[in-house]
Amino acid sequence: MASTKTTTTTDLTPEERYDLITSNLQEVLKPNIIKSVLAENRPLKVYWGTAPTGRPHCGYFVPMVKLAHFLRAGCEVTVLLADIHAFLDNLKAPLELVTHRAKYYELVIKSVLRAIGVPIEKLRFVLGSSYQQGAAYVMDLFRLSSIVTEHDAKKAGAEVVKQVASPLLSGLIYPLMQALDEEHLGVDAQFGGVDQRKIFTLAAENLPGIGFKERAHLMNPMVPGLAGGKMSASDPNSKIDLLDGEEVVRSKLRKSHCAPGEVEGNGVISFVEYVLFPIAELADEKGEGKFVVPRDEKWGGPVTYSSAAELKKDYKEDKLSPMDLKRGVEEALNKLLDPIRKDYEQDEEFKKVAELAYPAEVKVKKKKEKKIGTGYVPKDKKTTAEKVTDGVIKPQEAVEVAVGTSAKDAQDKLARTAE
């Protein structure tokens, strides 16, 4: 992909920098904190954290675009590879794998940013365990835990931490650590998905209680998955992996939920709106994004859209079919993924780390259990039905009965035996 626009920080006023920082976001908490930092003419320090659990998918393009905006606005950006968080989240990443997954995430994120033309030299990557096991951090965790209730901690992580029937204590520690990261990374703002809102609120309400300043919080919308609902790394039917091949991308898109005329909850349209258009804007000198649908001539020929609103209007009015929309997304997405796939194929370290981070599952063949009671039982081991005596169940020894040659003889002998 072509490099991004050449607008520099010095070309932007504080107001323009604020508009760029907050563009395409769903919500901003405490925007005045951001404005006051920009008014001081100093760079806004912001961090985005990601827990290295499942393989990163195409939904990661959404925060990557915002990182590009932050950098262009002159922000100092930190990417937190939250390895301890990955372990705390109901053991989504076992300890023996989490280090490899953190490295894999770093390689993938850098490749994605290069693919959309973002200079990565100004990014700072930090591994959570590099400071979260220190004495000062642990003591701050104790202090924070002394003022946050179990109810509030559980509520904060409800949309982020995996919910199970018997919640683990680790799920309550998770949101407290995410709040503390703001202080220990020395930032002015934290960025994340809107699903992080309750954790952001917990941080804003409780950090001042242990003597730390309140931060601003920036939230991007959550892109619906291909099957509807949230795009998730744990649901293979909801997402396209960043290293999926062209045929896999085509297959997943063709199977995706994309009802004619329906815009709300349509994962394919949302992907165009929140990924393809913003990336196209990054690459254009004038910041104007375009999305091309390669339609057959008999259906009107190729059509170019300059905005998501324009595309949605045509889709609602059935001027754009689901199949044509999917073809356009397939073509644009494969162009985005090509340099990422090439990075992987040409980098032996990348391949090795991927193997270590996500080892192939070994299927263990289950042994058939021997059915009890079907084998031969020696004569001296035979027992009759169990007999209850004084509340204690005792097996009776088997009694052999010669039943004779007639029904009358058998009944008489059985009656005598029972006496």
Regions found by a protein language model. Give the residues of each.
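Divalent-metal (Mg2+/Mn2+/Ca2+)-assisted nucleotide/phosphate chemistry catalytic cores
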Residues: 89, 94-219
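An acidic- and aromatic-residue-enriched active-site/binding cleft used to recognize and process polar
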Residues: 51, 82-84, 128-130, 194-196, ...
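Conserved nucleotide- and phosphate/pyrophosphate-binding catalytic cores
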Residues: 179, 185, 197-419
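N-terminal catalytic cores of NTP/NDP-binding nucleotidyl/phosphoryl-transfer enzymes
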Residues: 27-90, 189-203
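Short secondary-structure boundary/capping segments
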Residues: 63, 93-97, 142, 235, ...
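Positively charged, low-complexity intrinsically disordered leader regions
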Residues: 2-46
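Short acidic-hydrophobic, aromatic-tinged amphipathic segments that line or gate anion-handling sites
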Residues: 25-29, 126, 240-242
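Divalent metal-coordination and catalytic microenvironments
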Residues: 57, 109, 228
